[in-house]
Amino acid sequence: MRKLILLLLISGSAWAQQTPVKKYGLQDFMMIEKVEDQDKYYNENKAQLAEKEDNSFRAELAVNWLAKGNLEKYNHYQAAQPKYNLIQFLNLTYALEKLFDEKKQYAAVARYTNEFLEQLKKGTLTDAVGRAHVLMDLNAAANAKLGNIEAAKAMIANSAGKKVASASDNGYFKDVKSNYLNRYAIVMSAAGEPKIAFDTLSKAFREADSNPYMVETFKDIYKQVRGSDKGFDQYLKSLQDEAYQKYYHKVEKMYVESPTLPLTGTMPHAKQPDKFLNTFLANKPLREITLNALDGKPVNLGDYNGKILVLDFWSTGCTPCVAAFAGFEKVVAEYKKSEFQLFVVNLFEPQAEVKVFAARKPVKLEILQDEENKAYAVTATPTKIIFDPMGNIRFFSSGYAGSTDREYYKLKAMVEITKHRNQ
């Protein structure tokens, strides 16, 4: 197996980060797909668990129940104050974001984030992945929603979220900058500063530092500033169109005019932009490549001649890989009636692990597997390759774009340019 050029802080699969497999080890526990079955497994076997394993199981159950929105179950397992490992803490922050953005459980988010911030302050919880600012931003926004304005203002002022969002390299975790801007705008709006919030979100959408959850926030703030929501849809579309055109012109320069095989993909060196690193090697036509779907059925890529085909290479432990999926989902939805196909191709990992990960997330995209990395010898994830209807490579790109909307704009532009130049 070739060594990956990691666009990661955390290497290997999520399971590789956990307690070694034992008879009742955490790895076995994590391979149970449904949290309901995990709960049953734990309660049937807890008497046989060592203290360390019992803690790991409780932490895993707390995270997974929270991700599902079952606060009663979460509270039950959190009551013992389990110690979270690195992956569990990361997943905990994702679950809290989901609780805020989708479930709108603001009181619970305010309470839970405050508890974890207190633990971080006392040193009983460790933030090894730099996500404390997410807890602070969520706490601020939740308090703003609850009318606790002074607490919200104090928390957002002390958060490192602005600094993290302003960093030149914020393309690791999903929607880092856009989430911060959304929560900052929520606080400013509640604090009687709707114009600041309006300008913040206008700029965010114009520059593609945006995601779908921000639309509702922006519409509420638009009504505060303009007196009604009349004209909002048109205004938002104008900002989104401006952002798309910007990335269309950037992407246009990446078009592969002469896609002769063999073709080596490259990416700029992170610290030496004038140097390039190889990311994949394409040395055979699509018709000679067959990969397995997640159900084990073979898929010959040559069957997609006549369609624009996108292959995105990923692994379960690659955080930016999975962060990009939300943008891909928007593209797939837009082209569902077109001659278009997108696969996310998992590398290096066995089918069982990928199936559990895909079900739990859930991953809504079609998955293929290349466990031995034979098709394109990929050396950097995430990497995507776009083929024209004749099977020629027309675009390739590595890395996560930094926001759901920017990822969507960039891939959509690649699809549109490929379509228009190959009619």
List each model region and its residues.
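Conserved redox-active cysteine motifs that mediate thiol-disulfide chemistry
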Residues: 305-306, 313-330
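Helix-turn-helix repeat elements of alpha-solenoid scaffolds
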Residues: 28-43, 63-77, 102-119, 148-164
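A short beta-strand-turn-helix
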Residues: 288-309, 334-335
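N-proximal helix/coil linker or "cap" segments that precede and/or mark the start of modular domains
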Residues: 210-288, 302-304, 356
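Generic helix N-cap/helix-start motif at coil->alpha-helix transitions
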Residues: 18-25, 49-60, 84-97, 127-138, ...
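Structural microenvironment flanking redox-active thiols in thiol-disulfide oxidoreductases
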Residues: 322-361, 370-375
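Thiol/disulfide oxidoreductase modules built on the thioredoxin-like
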Residues: 357-363, 370-417
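Flexible helix-coil transition and linker loops at the boundaries of alpha-helical arrays
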Residues: 39-55, 78-88, 102, 118-130, ...
